[in-house]
Amino acid sequence: MTKYQPYTVQDVKDSSARELFTVVSTFAGGGGSSTGYRLAGGKVIAINEFVEEAIKTYSTNFPDTKIVPGDIKTLTGNDLLKAAGLKPGELDILDGSPPCSAFSVAGKREKGWNKEKSYSDGMKVENIEDLFLEFIRIAEEIQPKVIIAENVKGITMGEATKKLNEFINAFSNIKPGYHVTYEVLSAANFGTPQGRERTFFICIRHDVADKVGIHMFNANQTVFPNPITPEHISISQAFENLVNDPEEEKMLEDY
C-alpha cells in the first residue's frame, strides 16, 4: 500500500536551504506552489500577490521571501528582478498560476469571457482571462531560464482551446526563444490525496534546452514526469497518522 508522506514547515525550510535553483512566483497566494519548489530544493527569492490575507499567510510561513504586493497589471518584470537582485536572463524559474475561473468546467466558460468578474477578495476585474497574458508579459521582461504556469484542465477543452493557442503563441514569441510544452497532470498520481487535474505549461529557453538535450520533438516526453504513485492515496490514509492535540485546536468564532 502506498503511504502518504507528510511534511512540516521545517521540512520545507530545510529542503529549500539547499538552494539548488532560484524562483520568482506570481499569483503566489498563501504559498502553495512555493512550497513545492522549496521541497524540491529551490530558493523562492521574491513573489507577487495582491490579496492582503494571502500576503499575511505567506509572510508568516516564509518571512525571508521578498513580497512585491499589488496588481500584476501595474508591475513590470524589472520590479520583480529588483526585489530578487537579478538581471534579465539570470532567474532560473518564473512561476505563475493566473486566475482560471473563466476556463473552469465548473464555471460559465466562454459565456463569461470579456466580462467583469469578482477576483479573490471581491475586487472587480475586466477580462480576468487576460491576466494570463499579463504573466506572459512579465516573463518576456524577465527572460527566465524556465517558465512554469498552471491553469485548469478546461483550458484544453472546447472553445477554450482558442485561448490555449493564443497563450502558446505568446509564449513562443518571447525572446530569445522558448520550447513551449503543456500537459494535464493529476495530483493523485503524485502522492497527493486529491483528484485535482491541472494544465501545466513548461517553457524552456532555447539555450538552456540545448545544454540538457531537450528539443521540440522530445520536449513533452522529457519535461513532464511519469506518475510516481501506483496507487492513489485516500484522505483516510493521509489522516491516519495525524496527532489529536487539543492544545492545537482553535474554535472558529465568527461563523
Model features per residue range: what roles?
Residues 2-143, 153-157, 161-162:
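Core alpha/beta nucleotide-donor-binding catalytic domains of modification enzymes
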Residues 82-91, 101, 105-255:
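Class I S-adenosyl-L-methionine
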